[in-house]
Amino acid sequence: MQATAAAVISSVSGRAVPLHGNDIDTDRIIPARFLRCVTFDGLGEHAFEDDRRGLAAKGEVHVFDKPEYQGAKILFANKNFGCGSSREHAPQSLMRWGIEGVIAESFAEIFFGNCVSLGIPCAVVDEAAIGRLHAAAEKDPNAEWVLDVDARVIRGPITEPVAIPDGPRSQFL
């Protein structure tokens, strides 16, 4: 997804990928060794690189490597998503992997701002709601979801209200 300052993004539609864990920092989203790139091209394939390799070494599969979540457009995450250093590479890598919207319990402020600048809507839900969203995405990985920025709701197999601050919301609309 490429967004410009004038792009209207009233909603994001697609399948969702459920990522579990609090305090997932920018170093985990895109390891520091990938920050030397001159352009952001190719960063998507390295999203969560170290987490993915670590799980593969144990015979496990990271959610970003599971076939059923390939092509997902919406990311469901937990608390303090995107904490750590203020690198734009983190939301760039998610965007280039295919993520067009993120719903989490909370976001690191700079990460949130970088996402908004890139045209990636970020919405907040409470712990119980993210639990229900994770469960629904795991139960049916092929389910279609709509993050409705205008109505401040996520709709799919279940529907949950989301919080999007007025300022960022107005940038999308």
PLM feature segments, named:
Residues 1-173:
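Fe-S-dependent hydro-lyases/dehydratases of central metabolism
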